[in-house]
């Protein structure tokens, strides 16, 4: 492997090859890349997945560890670059992979600079499929983080923020200016962690289905939405009464705890 300075000079040279249609903005700030990997807290026995490895900014620091590490990207040329960069590291496995279809099971740590246009989709897949994951560290556009971290009553509060609350503790870690990338995006980024809890994946999937159903028409009341989801207004009224949720509340006015009460009654 080449030294760090030469490596990141090479990363910066990929600016002209960046594909805007798939959100390629290569991280060129070495300190930021090193911090992101350190936030992952890799330990002996971990199996690590990097999503969207790109030109290898995070991969360089991941390669300092001896644990098995899979790097996936949809860009064949970049995967070939990383296979060459890390050909002497038998634990590093660069490969073609689409995060929207790649199997997430078996990984204890997941990291990635997530493309803006599929940030929500990738996180949804992780939350509903990464059964063994204990920690994830992700960089997203700042506006995306604010949507993902939306609280009750906020216009962005909805199924995915609630699913995140159910599956993990979300912590804001680091602001990353747009100047840290080449080519520079139009907005600053932010790094956050997800520390996953022991809540059941199947229960998370059932909860997410309910949430998507009752948030289908955000401005309608929970009674209207739940009636549509269940196709039974009387059952919806009974469940809401038992859950102590007023009929006139809107979906964004209902807490995770209330939704979990409702879900329990539905399952019973």
Task: Locate predicted features.
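An accessory alpha-helical subdomain
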Residues: 190, 194-196, 202-238, 243-258, ...
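Catalytic cores of RNA-modifying enzymes
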Residues: 1-213, 252, 261
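Short, locally clustered residues in the helix-turn-helix/winged-helix DNA-binding domain
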Residues: 127, 227, 267
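Residue-level detector of secondary-structure transition/capping positions
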Residues: 86-87, 153, 230, 244, ...
